[in-house]
Amino acid sequence: MGLFDKIKKVWSQDMAIDLGTANTLVVVKGQGVVLNEPSVVAIVEQGGKKQVLAVGDEAKTMLGRTPGNIQAIRPLRDGVIADFIVTEEMIKHFIKKVHKGRSFANPRILICVPTGSTPVERKAIQDSALAAGARRVQLIEEPIAAAIGANLPISEATGSMVVDIGGGTSEIAVMSLGGLVYSKSLRVAGDAMDGAMVNYMRKEYNLMIGDSTAEKIKKEIGTAIPTNNNTYAVKGRDLRSGTPKEVNITEEDTAEALNEILRDMVNGIKDALESTPPELSADLVDMGLTLTGGGSLLKNIDKRFSKETGLPVHIADDPLSCVAIGTGKALENTPPELSADLVDMGLTMTGGGSLLKNIDKRFSKETGLPVNIADDPLSCVAIGTGKALDDQEIFSTVLSEY
């Protein structure tokens, strides 16, 4: 990578984050999705303080398998922060990982939030990202990001409907002319499906399973409408004997286990339709609704929703990444602060490398900014250090920054 590319990459470190209950996705401006890892942190408490051992993929492998002094936890619950300190450490880890550990990476961050989150919950997300090293944090509502990522025409004078089924929440929204006409956040989603599967196995088979096993069942054989006689072997602990046990379950089992969760989602969709103005309702009859999020990958969920609502139901092309992609697109159209000043002031080059013939012209041509070379580029750093020592106000400012 050339010098100019490195400089441009530092300038383009703004990030969009889909901070999900189950997974966190990061989009870097101009680079697309660069990180997709579980929102899991492994910690150990020493001297009353939490010390992070692992984050993301590595931490998820520890869920339910850690010794007593180590905890593998999800710091977000129902789409909002449940543990501020651990969330801060998780965001900090992801920022460093994306920017290769550069200590000076202080990106501007756009984070999506559930529509039902309170002002206190939203401030907690902003504060956590700022404490993790962001220089500025802005928020976007999750269904808007999902709709943008799914390429729905939300800026037009027609109705668009999206149902984003994440880990902690299901976001239901109707949009038109770039705004939300109706929105509702249901705290039933992927995690609730896993919990329902755990409860079903305990009740019907006297088998205790963990959340990870429940998630595997959902992905392998889970369905909203059973269509065949497939079976799946489930291993767990027999509640009567306490010994390991294996049972075979069918699609009928999973459909029954998930029935109540899916019914709650359908009722939420019907509430949205009843609250939608008649003019937009007519659009939805033709346009239907679009499903995004990991929960939309449940087999036959589109068929069940269509059958019970009477609307066409479409699954987005990349449902797992829709929110992150939409947040990234919104970031591309959000002008960075001070950009107007930089257009006028330009950038100033110092150091011996700035004496390379025409380097200012090359940088100006490729950035569109005025580029100035300092009067004494070789001595700028030394002169500035001397001024900081002589000027108490500057010296105090420098100290306060570090």
Indicate residue ranges for each PLM-predicted region.
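Nucleotide/phosphate-binding catalytic cleft detector across ATP-hydrolyzing
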Residues: M1-I165, A173-T290, S296-Y402
